[in-house]
Amino acid sequence: MFLEYTKKKLINKSIVEYLQVKNQDIISVSGAGGKTSTIKLLAKNLVREHKKILITTTTKMFKTADAITIRDKNLLKQKLKQQNWVFTGQDYGEKISSWDEEFLREIIFLADITLIEADGAKRLPFKFPNKMNPFIYLHQIK
């Protein structure tokens, strides 16, 4: 929960309320720590609101057992009908990496909300980004 001080009152808000998340939002999370945890927290809260969530990356993320690593828009669409969220990216050993931008454009609006891990710090406590980091999807909304 987040506390917001408004009109001389402290108001409890969920992360979804605090960020004012709406349908068709694309949310990229970047920084040196807590990206995956933040994405999981957002997804958990959005699922409670009966939203369909697509989780992907523009960098690399540790792969979950249920990650979809097959480049198939129809499979992703089918999985989103069966469950509330889908984790997807290209197979990269123990991790997944970003789909190419063309496929990302095809799948990004399959779900109500898309969550993207947009920056990697390789488990270091801080990072000095270069011109290429973080990679934020061109049609970024939040």
What residues fall within each predicted segment?
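Charged, amphipathic alpha-helical linker segments immediately N-terminal to NTP-binding catalytic cores
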Residues: 1-5
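Walker A (P-loop) phosphate-binding motif
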Residues: 9-49
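Residue-level preference for the first positions of well-ordered beta-strands
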Residues: 24-28, 52-54, 84-87, 113-115
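Short, ordered loop/turn segments at secondary-structure junctions
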Residues: 32-33, 58-60, 120
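Short glycine-/acidic-enriched loop or helix-start segments at secondary-structure transitions
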Residues: 39, 64-66, 124-127
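N-terminal phosphate/diphosphate-binding loop that engages ATP/GTP or pyrophosphate donors
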Residues: 43-94
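Phosphate-binding/switch loop-helix module in NTP-utilizing enzymes
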Residues: 90-129, 133-134
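Gly/Ser/Thr-rich active-site loops/lids in small-molecule metabolic enzymes
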Residues: 135-142
